[in-house]
Amino acid sequence: PANYFHILRRQMMRDFRKPLVLMTPKSTLRHKANTSPLTDFVNGSTFHRVISNHLSDDEYKNVNRIIFCSGKIYFELQDHINELQLKNVYIIRLEQLYPFPYEALNEGIKKFNHCEMIWCQEEPQNMGAWEFIENRLKSVLHLVGAKNELHFIGRRAAASPATGVFDRHLANQKNIIRLATEANLDEIEKEKSGVSLVKYKLPIE
């Protein structure tokens, strides 16, 4: 909520006008973790283009996988990480896609250049942020000397943004979260064209 407040405030307080496009799904309004302390609204606080959690030195040493994401899928990923008590996975959220936050990302991932790098989205591969951010994010990873390539996890490219079958949607969503947080890179590489249910003998989306 604080970041949403600050982006609106920034838009109105600037001495010039340009379009602001916000994508805010309703489901996050009901999520218990979607809260901000009062201090995040005041005392010189501002809009954050990139958000990540603070880690202690011991916690940092355990991290070997970075998940980049944007939007509400963060809450599902974090819930799953908390449920399984995964100490090796760290999430970096892109709160602004354009202009792309090169500098903020650069600073945020320098010390993680040894980690596996994942971009996770629930949208099909030809939708969502992936096709826009792929080369931009790869350029940042190159600058910080990342040891591993960037892997995509999301739904298979499709003509429609939705499956039309709720059970199918949930099964794919569960698989996306599992791949991003638990699967090894070999399994992720096999799914690089996107998640679908064809292997479960269900219709392709």
Where are the regions that the model predicts?
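Secondary-structure transition/capping motifs at alpha-helix termini
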Residues: M13-R17, K61, H80-V89, K111-C115, ...
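A short acidic (Asp/Glu
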Residues: Y4-R9, H31-N34, L77-H80, P101-A104, ...
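Generic long, charged, amphipathic alpha-helical segments
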Residues: Y74-N113
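Short glycine-rich or small-residue beta-strand-to-loop segments that form or flank ligand, phosphate
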Residues: N64-F68, E116-E123
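Active-site phosphate/pyrophosphate-binding segments
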Residues: P1-I73
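A short, gly/pro- and small-residue-rich
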Residues: P37-T46, L84-Y90, A129-G145
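Charge-patterned, long linear interaction tracts outside catalytic cores
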Residues: V63-R65, C69-G71, L77-Q78, K192-E205
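Peripheral docking tails and interdomain loops at the edges
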Residues: P1-A2, R10-R14, L20, P25-T28, ...
